[in-house]
Regions:
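Segments forming oxygen-rich coordination pockets for charged ligands
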Residues: 1-214, 231-235, 276, 281, ...
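ADP-ribose/adenylate-binding Rossmann-like module
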Residues: 198-199, 235-246, 251-276
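A generic structural signal for alpha->beta connector loops
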Residues: 192, 213-214, 257-258, 286-289
Length: 337
């Protein structure tokens, strides 16, 4: 299983684990799900000795019971695996009707200070590399249960071993540092994405205007894309509001295999940009034109920067997960299938 959406929780958990003076902690990992569940396998909850919590494994209905079990795991040092069955319509096992209609298995393990897998994961996040983890949660000896770096030959076993590949945070590059880019940065950071602001205008692309951005790049419009070198895992949106900037940016971006390319503005403006690119000698294929999300965003009736940012991020999320962005009530399959 490859992990994208849980990276924000993981970033916070890893930061706590590799801190200079880490707190004694127990890690709860959701290792398997049968049926419906609020969270999917790989969701984690870190419980420190002072009961500080980082992350989540449910919508809030399992955490109290897990914390009680974590106290026992912390005291004994022995890992534990617990199964929560929420398939009953009258499920009141923990004092609430969970109503998730699923069976989930959670592993609880006491962690040593700065566990090696967390150190490697922190390094790979910084270097934007993937990390393969193996979580053993079954077998005769609980002494070997827990999280480690995956090794060659590891094979997933739903009854004993959960394997996951953790991708680095989703990379979003916003070409344009206008005021409407600010809520887009904030919303993307709420999702744990790595956000780069790029703009030819150095007076706009500043740390004071974009304190949450991970990187800020300035320079001539026809050099910006080459300097950033966005790859196939990068989301990109062009929103400088200046035709003279958008044209060279779009020309450079259309030649790259991006995960997503969006252009702010009406369809007529996008068509004119594409026509001008053809006039300038760019061979624009039907596939390249179809790759361009213009106008950018979902049709949410957005009005104002915050709503436009929501529409843009929602479309990007749908593209990342291969979904059609239709209402869930119109979906015949289970939500997570």
């Amino acid at each position: 299983m490859t992990v994208f959406g849980r990276v924000k929780d993981l970033q916070a958990i890893v930061a706590a684990l590799v801190a200079e003076d880490p707190k004694p902690s127990v890690l709860a990992t959701l290792v398997s799900v049968s049926g419906s569940s609020y969270r999917r396998p790989g969701a984690r909850l870190l419980i420190a000795a002072d009961k500080e919590r980082t992350g989540s494994i449910s919508g809030g209905c399992l955490e109290e019971d897990v914390m009680a079990r974590a106290a026992r795991v912390s005291a004994t040092g022995q890992a534990d695996a617990v199964v929560y069955d929420t398939t009953s319509e009258n499920d009141l096992v923990w004092g609430v009707g969970l109503g998730c209609h699923g069976i989930v298995r959670v592993l609880l393990e006491k962690l040593p200070p700065r566990p090696p897998w967390a150190t490697v994961l922190a390094e790979n996040f910084a270097r934007r590399r993937r990390t393969a983890l193996a979580i053993l949660h079954g077998g005769d000896s609980t002494q070997s249960w827990g999280t480690r770096l995956a090794a060659p030959g590891d094979c997933a076993d739903p009854d004993a071993l959960f394997l996951e590949t953790i991708s680095p945070p989703t990379a979003l590059t916003i070409f344009g540092a206008g005021d409407d880019a600010q809520p887009l940065v904030r919303l993307a950071k709420e999702l744990g994405w790595y956000v780069t602001i790029a703009d030819p205008r150095g007076a706009f692309a500043t740390a004071s205007r974009f304190p949450m951005a991970d990187a800020i790049v300035t320079g001539p419009a026809d050099h910006l894309v080459a300097r950033i070198a966005p790859g196939p895992d990068t989301l990109a949106v062009v929103m400088t509001h200046h035709y003279v900037h958008d044209l060279p940016l779009l020309r450079a971006l259309l030649d790259r295999p991006l995960a997503y390319l969006g252009l702010l503005g009406p369809r007529k403006r996008a068509d004119k940009l594409c026509d001008d690119l053809r006039t300038a000698g760019l061979t624009l294929s039907a596939e390249q034109r179809a790759q361009l999300h213009a106008p950018v965003g979902l049709d949410l009736g957005a009005d104002g920067p915050e709503q436009v940012a929501l529409a843009i991020v929602a479309e990007m999320q749908a593209v990342l997960t291969g979904r059609n962005a239709r209402p869930l009530r119109e979906r015949d399959l289970p939500i997570h299938d």
